């Protein structure tokens, strides 16, 4: 399963974004995706997310679904700013 490192601009802070992301876990999981970790920059205007996804196109096929897009926008995500930084080959989360 591919992993992606993705970023998106946010306007309502990290807590609001994470609440939305948690509410999407079941929907995303039913399509084979899972957030591995998420972090924000110091001023909470961008989120960086590492995800397991069923295929590299997942951000387009799932992330732009009308119901998902609406939830993301309501949580302050600038959906049009969503950018796949890179596909991840291997990673280490530390001890």
Question: Where are these predicted regions, by residue range?
Answer:
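Short S/T/G/P-rich N-terminal loop/turn motif that feeds into the first structured element of a domain
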Residues: 1-69, 74-95
């Amino acid at each position: 399963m591919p992993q992606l490192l993705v970023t998106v601009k946010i306007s309502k802070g990290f807590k609001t974004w994470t609440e939305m992301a948690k509410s999407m876990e079941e929907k995303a999981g039913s399509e084979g995706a899972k957030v591995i970790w998420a972090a924000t920059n110091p001023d909470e205007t961008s989120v960086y997310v590492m995800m397991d996804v069923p295929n590299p196109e997942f951000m387009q096929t799932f992330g732009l679904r009308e119901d998902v897009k609406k939830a993301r926008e309501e949580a302050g995500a600038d959906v049009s700013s969503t950018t796949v930084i890179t596909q991840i080959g291997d990673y280490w989360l530390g001890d």
